[in-house]
């Protein structure tokens, strides 16, 4: 998934390297900061491991506005995941190894992240088998379009002072964000399925006007076993 600045928010290559980038809500942004989109692109195109890449990044973290970056190396026998944030308010700068299992990440430590992680876990437990692939995709897409408001959320209120008590502030509290009056909101959904044989199904829905366009790609990972 590409960003407007030539980088990417999410990327996966056939060697099993995956990266996802989240911006964070922050009150004070750096002027002339470097584009964060290249953090994803450079990891996927490079040869560094998840840990090596983030360790290298630690030395230049201050030239970017706030972000969270998840890097994953996937093989048929293992999954290596690391997480880095340069945002001090979220206990950063922090570099962590992530254990296998269900993990939820968001633009901040919001209620919708915790509730979303629970619902995601329930869906995967119920449908996370190859026999239920179509149902799994359907339920995950429904989850990504979940517009329930998790409000009031004290952390969200603290980080969105420009919208005190407004409907827009409340709309930030849902998984699926939609603000037509501001031409702002969720524009892309991505679901990536990888089985034990390295077969990949990459589904992406992107909003264009009022239409959601769906693209599906399949491939096989060439990661080392």
Identify the residue ranges that each predicted region occupies.
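N-terminal nucleophile
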Residues: 1-225
């Amino acid at each position: 998934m590409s960003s407007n600045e030539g980088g990417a928010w999410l990327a996966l290559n056939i060697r099993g390297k995956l990266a996802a980038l989240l911006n964070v809500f922050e009150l004070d942004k750096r002027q002339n900061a470097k584009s964060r989109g290249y953090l994803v692109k450079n990891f996927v195109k490079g040869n560094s491991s998840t840990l090596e890449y983030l360790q290298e990044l630690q030395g230049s973290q201050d030239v970017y506005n706030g972000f969270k970056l998840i890097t994953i190396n996937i093989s048929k026998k293992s999954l290596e995941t690391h997480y880095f944030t340069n945002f001090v308010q979220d206990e950063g700068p922090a570099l962590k190894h992530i254990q296998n299992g269900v993990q939820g990440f968001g633009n901040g430590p919001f209620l919708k992240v915790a509730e979303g992680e629970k619902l995601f876990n329930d869906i995967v437990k119920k449908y996370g088998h190859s026999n239920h692939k179509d149902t799994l995709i359907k339920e995950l897409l429904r989850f990504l379009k979940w517009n329930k408001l998790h409000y009031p959320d004290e952390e969200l209120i603290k980080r969105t002072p420009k919208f005190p008590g407004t409907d827009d502030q409340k709309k930030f509290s849902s998984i699926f964000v939609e603000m037509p009056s501001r031409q702002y909101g969720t524009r892309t959904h991505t679901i990536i399925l990888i089985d034990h044989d390295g077969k990949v199904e990459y589904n992406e829905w992107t909003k264009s006007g009022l239409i959601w366009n769906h693209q599906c790609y399949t491939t096989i990972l060439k990661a080392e076993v």
